[in-house]
Amino acid sequence: MDLETIRKVDPEAAKAIEQELDRQQFTLELIASENIASPAVMAAQGSVMTNKYAEGYPGHRYYGGCEFVDVAENLARDRAKELFQADYANVQPHSGSQANMGVYFALLEPGDTVLGMDLSHGGHLTHGSPVSFSGRIFNFIHYGVKEKTGTIDYDQLRSLAKEHKPKLIVAGASAYPRIIDFPELEKIARETGAYLMVDMAHIAGLVAAGEHPSPLPYADVVTTTTHKTLRGPRGGMILSNKGFGKKLSSQIFPGIQGGPLMHVIAAKAVAFKEALTPEFKAYQQQVVKNAACLAKRLMDNGVDLVSGGTDNHMMLLNLSNLDITGKEAEGLVEQAGITVNKNTIPFDKNGPAVTSGIRVGTPTITSRGMKEPEMELIADCLANVLKNPQDQALIESTRAKVKDLCQSFPIYA
C-alpha cells in the first residue's frame, strides 16, 4: 500500500488511511458484509482506469479512446457469466442498491405492487423500506419469518402473493442465516404471475463456489454486490438468464447512471478471475465451516441464535436473555477489539437504532486464514464479554487475546 505517495501530498488523509489499516490489522472484523480485498483488486481500483470516461457499453460508447476500458469491461462481464452460469451480466452498477434500482425501473412502473422481505426480519432497505427510494416509489408488501423457527414463512409469502398479486417478488436478505428455497419462490411467482428477483449480495461468493444453491436457474433477474463474500471491490452487478438484457442495460445507462467507474470495473474483472480459482472455492468452504463452528460454540456458551444456527456465512445473535441491547453490545465488544453491528431480530421490541441483536459473520476472519480452533476462541471471547458487560478486567484481557490472535493472522502479510 503506497502510503508514502499520499503522505507527501496529504498527510492528514494518509494518517486516516494508516489508522484504518492499523484498526483492521489489530481487531477482529465480524461484520458479515465486510471482507478483505486482495492487493491485486486494490491495485486495479487505483489504476489509470480511473481517468477514463466511458458512457455506454463496450463497442457502443459515447466517448473516444475506449478500446482498453472495453477490454476490462468485457473481461468482467465474461468472467461473471462463467462464474454464475448466466447469459447476461451488467457490471456497471455502482452499488447493490443501484443494481436493485435498475431492475425495479426495468420491470416495474411507479406504484406497482412488490412483495419483499421485511427489513426487521432480515430484508434490506431497498426491499421496500419506507425510508428508501424503493418504498417511496413502489407499493411494497412485506413477508417475514416464522416466530417459532426464525425461518422464512413461505406459506405467508404465498398467501400474500395470492392476495396482492404483486408484479415482482423480491427475495434475498441482509440478515438471514439460512438457505433460501429458490425453487419454492419460483413456484409462488409463477402461480401468481409475478416476476422473481433475487438479491444475493450476501451469499454471492458462496453461490459462486457451490456452497449455497444458485438462484440463477429460478429467478428472472439476480442482483448482487461485488464485495462481501465475493471479495471484490465495492460495487454492484445484475445477472439474468431470462432475456431481459436490453431492458436492464438501458435502465442502468442512461436510466440511472452516467459514466461507469472503469477502475472499479477493472477491479471486478480481477476479483472474478480470483473467484474462478480452486483456492476461492476452498476459501468459501472454510467460510461456511467457520460459521457453523462459531455458531455452535456460541450456543454452547448460552448465546441464543435466531433460527438456532446458520447455513451460510452469518448468524444473528438474540441478546434478549442477556439483558443487553444490540447497541450496547456493539460498543462493548468493540472495547475488546471485536467489531460487529447491532441488528434488529425478528419481532424485535427495540427500534433499529437500539435493537435486540447483533449480526456476526466469518468472511473477513476466514480471509485472514483462521479456521475452527480460532472460531472456538473467538466465540468464547465474544460470549464472555457479552455475559459480563461490567467486567472491565475481562474486557482488557480479551482485547489482549484478540491482539495476539490478529498478530498471528496478519492481513496483507
Swiss-Prot record:
This is Serine hydroxymethyltransferase. Its cofactor is pyridoxal 5'-phosphate. The modification N6-(pyridoxal phosphate)lysine is found at K228. It is found in: Cytoplasm. The keyword Transferase applies. The lineage of its organism: Bacteria, Pseudomonadati, Thermodesulfobacteriota, Desulfobacteria, Desulfobacterales. Homodimer. Catalyzes the reversible interconversion of serine and glycine with tetrahydrofolate (THF) serving as the one-carbon carrier. This reaction serves as the major source of one-carbon groups required for the biosynthesis of purines, thymidylate, methionine, and other important biomolecules. Also exhibits THF-independent aldolase activity toward beta-hydroxyamino acids, producing glycine and aldehydes, via a retro-aldol mechanism.
